[in-house]
């Protein structure tokens, strides 16, 4: 069985791989964005990666950010196409994202989830708050049940904005 490490992307190589995988998924594969998917939120979002322990390759991504005190969002959740069999990576990224935010004072954790992934999130103790369209694609605004995502020991790093630039 393949194993993965779920962690904050902290060094230049991890951050470059994080943005490259996002670009491959959201701009090239899904064509939700032209060129790349970097936006203003990336200036204050924390990137989280799934790393295949055997190869040290970044195979999954998600970002978290505090929209206002206590209100956190997750977004840009994606898995490398060659690693999509099963839900292990997505589940691990979601768990790492929500438990990390919960450690840092999260009172509510939200995400806009593509329609095809809503049932998966519901199995992970999320509820749909409303249906919406983003870039003409159906999504649900969903909320995590924080009681299933206990705080961990992750120390909140100081953001290094230049390192967050897309490569």
What are these regions (language model features)?
Residues 1-47, 51-57, 153-167:
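Short amphipathic alpha-helix that is part of the acyltransferase structural core
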Residues 49-51, 141-145:
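Short, well-ordered beta-strand micro-motif
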Residues 100-114:
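Conserved GNAT acetyl-CoA-binding A-motif
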Residues 79, 85-99:
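Conserved acetyl-CoA-binding loop-helix of GNAT-fold acetyltransferases
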